[in-house]
Regions:
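Start-transfer (signal-anchor) and selected internal transmembrane alpha helices
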Residues: 1-27, 217-224
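Transmembrane-helix signature of polytopic, membrane-embedded enzymes
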Residues: 13-19, 107-129
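Extracytosolic helix-loop segments that constitute the early lumenal/periplasmic catalytic or substrate-binding loops
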Residues: 25-26, 43-66, 73, 80, ...
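Transmembrane-lumen/periplasm boundary regions of multi-pass, lipid-linked membrane glycan transferases
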Residues: 46-49, 176, 180, 189-335, ...
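Transmembrane-helix motifs of polytopic, lipid-linked glycan transferases
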Residues: 94-114, 152
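Specific aromatic-rich, kink-prone transmembrane helix
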Residues: 106, 145-163, 344-347
């Protein structure tokens, strides 16, 4: 699935690790910029604190009562962080940064396998330096841990899908990712990975896709992963008097899928239809500043101009089912769509690593320029909003937050200058990432 060899800089494992570490440090520096302001941050942090205080690592609790909202993996990790750093906001958020760093490195490995090392490198930078991941990578939320586990399974499948014969190695990594994703956020991880595997296998040519026996092996490994999850879930449900099943699965999984909860989503069928495409603007804002690449990427992937068929199929099988699943769910929150972001980042990386194709195809060049001007307009509006916050709220914003948003403006301008000068999308993308860092 790799593209043909290219001349010029080809980032390796060392460069990818250094970039992942740099973004991780950047996210850690952002953490003290604000107190725990999201309601979920306070819930999760308190549940982790109570685990430490009570020694009950089986059943999460909040204010002494069963807290059946989510499985325990993130609470376990937060509790470990509290034991090292003390009970404070930084400790509550700490786990998210390295988890996001792991996601970035795995995205590089996936992009390297599907397209080229430079495509993978741009993809990891695009993922790590978009608005949504900057927020979730510096917040006491569960999403960064979930994303890392999803990316682990996706990377293992990318290697197997590309013909790697080390089935038991990558099959084991696939199962570990599935198990961790379930311990992080229940069935969300498998709901992303299973369609990715199914569609990219079914629609691949029979001569190039993994053998059917390997698919049976992955199914058995997934059952083992489910068994690992049940090894926690069954005792926890018994200890909670059935609350983990009734509330955790019945309300917070099945209930959220079919009914808008806590005002997150439209009420009634009219409200449901009105909110159906809410994730389109969420992606446009959340993937900023890399939304500049999406019009050209979607056009290039749809027309078969970027990457080979296997690579495009892999990305489509990740992006489309994930987007459709969260779109159809009744309850909608912006961070729910995060599992689709690595696929978007892979598209961005593939575009940035294919300057010859983009500049040769007038339609792709047009869409890239369109994305740029939308990017500039949104950047200016965002910077204006950030600068206006002190006047509107009466509170000063932390310097890391202000610097991060200011850097986005410089980054967008740096990228477009390189594109307009036809100096190469890869060089421009690196200028953007450097300015943002």
């Amino acid at each position: 699935m790799n593209a043909a060899p290219r001349s010029g800089f080809e980032p390796g494992i060392g460069a990818a690790l250094a970039a992942a570490l740099a973004v991780t440090v950047f996210l850690l520096l952002l953490m003290p910029a604000a107190m725990l302001w999201d309601r979920d941050e306070t819930y999760y942090a308190r549940a982790a604190v109570e685990m430490l205080e009570t020694g009950n690592w089986l059943v999460p609790a909040f204010n002494g009562e069963v807290f059946a909202h989510k499985p325990p993996l993130a609470y376990w990790l937060m509790a470990a962080s509290f034991s090292v750093f003390g009970e404070n906001e930084f400790a509550a958020r700490f786990v998210s940064a390295p988890a996001m760093g792991v996601s970035l490195f795995l995205t590089f490995l996936i992009g390297r396998r599907l397209f080229s090392p430079r495509a993978g490198f741009v993809a990891m930078i695009a993922l790590g330096l978009s608005v949504m991941t900057i927020y979730l990578g510096s917040a006491a939320m569960l999403d960064a841990v979930l994303l890392a586990s999803i990316c682990l399974s996706a990377w293992a499948w990318a290697e197997l899908h590309a013909g790697d014969r080390r089935f038991w190695l990558f099959g084991s990594l696939f199962g570990i990712g599935i198990a961790l994703s379930m311990l992080a956020k229940g069935p969300v991880g498998p709901a992303v990975i299973i369609p990715l595997v199914f569609f990219s296998w079914v629609f691949s040519p029979a001569a190039t896709r993994p053998a059917f026996r390997h698919m049976v092996g992955l199914a058995l490994i997934s059952i083992v992963a489910l068994g690992i999850f049940l090894g926690w879930a069954v005792p926890a449900n018994l200890a909670s008097g059935g609350e983990m099943l009734r509330i955790g699965l019945g309300k917070h999984v099945i209930g959220r899928a079919f009914q808008a909860m806590e005002g997150h989503g439209g009420s009634g069928w009219k409200g449901y239809l009105a909110s159906l495409l809410v994730y389109v603007p969420v992606i446009l804002i959340g993937f900023f500043p890399w939304t500049i690449t999406l019009p050209a990427a979607l056009s290039g992937f749809w027309r078969g101009l970027i990457g080979d068929r296997q690579a495009r199929l892999f990305v489509w099988s990740w992006l489309v089912p994930t987007f459709v699943m969260f779109t159809l769910a009744a309850t909608k929150l912006p961070h729910y769509i995060l599992p689709a972001f690595p696929a978007l980042a892979l598209m961005a990386g593939a575009v940035a690593a294919s300057p010859e194709t983009v500049l040769r195809e007038k339609r792709l060049s047009f869409w890239l320029q369109t994305g740029f001007w939308l990017n500039v307009a949104f950047t200016l509006a965002t910077i204006g909003g950030v600068l206006a916050l002190p006047a509107l709220t009466g509170k000063a914003i932390g310097w890391p937050l202000a610097m991060a948003f200011a850097a986005l403006l410089l980054a967008g301008l740096a990228l477009v200058r390189r594109v307009q000068n036809r100096a190469g999308l890869f060089t421009g993308a690196m200028a953007q990432s450097a300015a943002t860092l």
